[in-house]
Amino acid sequence: MSKENEVLLNEDIRAREVRCVGDDGTAYGVISRDEALEISNKLGLDLVLIAPDAKPPVCKIMDYGKFRYQQEKKQKEAKKKQKTIEIKEIKLSVKIAQNDINYKVKHASEFLQDGKHVKFRVFLKGREMSTPEAGVAMLEKVWEMIKDEADRDKEPIIEGRYVNMLVTPKKG
């Protein structure tokens, strides 16, 4: 366990006086640590330090095992709800044949139907670097073919030797 996530409980708590709260919300007020430990032992629960920076530190009497289980459960739920965005990249060139464009656009539409984002990338070779507008024109041509099933997230942008365009699945 890392230092930041480490929770002090029972005898590990060093403060002499603590503000103690019960698991059911009962406020015991400011009492000595030993007295708080005695109460927690009587109830068969743990004394957990929840606010170490407060004056005096705040402790709660609770079942630590159950508390940790619930925290882990919350983290798993949060992780499940997170959605990872997968970006598929399709590479093109300025001198690509029409049937190859059709093939790559077909693949892109399959990716979009699966809910993936697609990045079209035109690589500029040699003299093509002097006219990057040809790469932009190529991406505009691709956009005309795919605009019915996608939203354009990024307009065609010239980035070094590449011209990039990002499309996302249509919402709704």
Curated annotation (Swiss-Prot):
Could you list this entry's UniProt keywords, alphabetically sorted. Cytoplasm, Initiation factor, Protein biosynthesis
- Could you tell me where this protein is found in the cell? Cytoplasm
UniProt-listed NCBIfam families: infC (TIGR00168)
Among the GO molecular function terms of this UniProt record, one is: translation initiation factor activity
Q: Which Pfam families match?
A: IF3_C, IF3_N
**Which N-terminal stretch is annotated as signal sequence?**
none
Query: Is Mitochondrion among the key words of this record?
Result: no
PROSITE patterns in UniProt: IF3
Instruction: Output the lineage of the source organism.
Output: Bacteria, Pseudomonadati, Campylobacterota, Epsilonproteobacteria, Campylobacterales
**Protein family according to the UniProt entry:** Belongs to the IF-3 family.
Q: Show the InterPro entries listed in the entry.
A: T_IF-3_C_sf, T_IF-3_N_sf, Translation_initiation_fac3_CS, Translation_initiation_fac_3, Translation_initiation_fac_3_C, Translation_initiation_fac_3_N
Could you confirm whether the keyword Cell wall biogenesis/degradation appears in this record?
Answer: no
* HAMAP family xref list: IF_3
Q: What does this protein do?
A: IF-3 binds to the 30S ribosomal subunit and shifts the equilibrium between 70S ribosomes and their 50S and 30S subunits in favor of the free subunits, thus enhancing the availability of 30S subunits on which protein synthesis initiation begins.
Please name the GO terms of the biological process aspect recorded for this protein, alphabetically. ribosome disassembly
Protein name (database record): Translation initiation factor IF-3
| A cellular component term, taken from the record's GO annotations | cytosol
Subunit-level organization: Monomer.
